[in-house]
Regions:
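Hydrophobic/aromatic beta-strand patches that form the interior of the parallel beta-sheet core
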Residues: 7, 57-59, 137
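A structured beta-alpha segment of the ubiquitous adenosine-cofactor-binding alpha/beta core
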Residues: 1-51
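Rossmann-fold NAD(P)-binding glycine/threonine-rich loop
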Residues: 36, 40-94
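Acidic, glycine-rich segments within the central catalytic cores of soluble metabolic enzymes
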Residues: 85-180
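Residues at the C-termini of beta-strands that transition into short coil/loop
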Residues: 10, 62, 143
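A contiguous active-site-proximal alpha/beta segment in oxidoreductase catalytic domains
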Residues: 3, 29, 82, 111, ...
Length: 180
């Protein structure tokens, strides 16, 4: 956060919305992480802001995706790290005991989606530089955590296996573990 300048804006007031619109008119990127539909309900949807600035890259982290880019029965649900870890499946493969879900130490449900969103933002900014056209970019926290479980998804999809907690072991590599 070096050299970062922060402001607080009340988005529920017309004055606050006017400030956002004025900032967006000059901005390259807007990042938000409200539930799907929140900014739309405030009159600050991607579509309305893109009218003010066609080069705008509007980036959103959602718990379970955005209706603009796909459908999810959970799209309206709020989410945070531990919810993303549980729904994404990583808690089911972490720790030593089956039946006792364990969250991963770091907040991967928050940080991994943010890193993936950064990649999307960089690509969209590059596109805007070349074409003058902004984009809506979103990352679902659920999808990002599920991507961390890629081997488990393949095991289930192709072999019908339901992977469980592995502790310090690895089901495919040997020797593998903690040795003193």
């Amino acid at each position: 956060n070096r050299n970062k300048k922060s402001i607080s804006i009340d988005l529920k007031t017309e004055a606050g919305k006017a400030i956002v619109r004025r900032l967006v008119a000059e901005a390259d990127v807007l990042v938000e992480n409200f539930r799907a539909g929140t900014m739309d309900g405030l009159g600050l949807s991607y579509e309305s802001l893109a009218e003010l600035n066609p080069r705008l890259v509007y980036a959103a982290v959602r718990g379970f995706g955005d209706p603009r880019t796909g459908t999810s029965p959970y799209a309206e649900w709020p989410a945070f790290d531990v919810v993303a870890q549980a729904m994404g499946g990583i808690m089911g493969i972490t720790g030593p005991d089956r039946g006792q879900p364990l969250k991963v130490g770091p907040g991967v449900g928050d940080t991994v989606p943010a890193m993936l969103l950064t990649v999307g933002i960089l690509a969209a900014v590059r596109h805007a530089e070349r074409t003058g056209e902004g984009q809506f970019v979103d990352v679902a926290m659920y999808d990002a955590v599920l991507a961390l479980c890629e081997r488990m998804v393949h095991q289930h999809s192709y072999a019908g296996e339901v992977p469980g907690p592995e502790g310090n072991a690895h089901p495919l590599l040997c020797p593998f573990g903690m040795f003193a």
